[in-house]
Amino acid sequence: NFRNETVDWKHLAEFNQSEGIVVSHDVNFRHLKGYLRQFFTRLGYDDVRLRPAYYPYTELSVEVDVYDDEQAEWVGLGGAGMFRPEVVKPLLGFEAPVLAWGLGPGRIIMRQHDISDMREMYRNDLELLRDTEAWVR
């Protein structure tokens, strides 16, 4: 996906996103918040912040930020929300609560591999590629 951002240590002109959904009559926004906090805590992020956000297909919506000690700032890792009913029925053919999230793996990979600048992951550095067993563990 293209993003109209100034390229810097945490932004590129393009981004990748991994998405997930949970469909169940027994889930609500509290469950989504719990899934997100547990997911990022298990990845090793101690400070996870959920901020209100706007996404056209979800309501309630949040942005997920984690605190980056090295950069001394909050860094966004994804967005999430509850699919709006007018999205769910045409998509699934029935009404049910749907938890949805989209997470960018780039900044997560940076932390796992001690990379301080996202642009490093896209250089044609054969030594880096040979020395890196896998980007995602």
Where would I find each of the regions flagged by the language model?
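TRNA-recognition modules of translation machinery and tRNA-sensing kinases, especially anticodon-binding
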Residues: 1-137
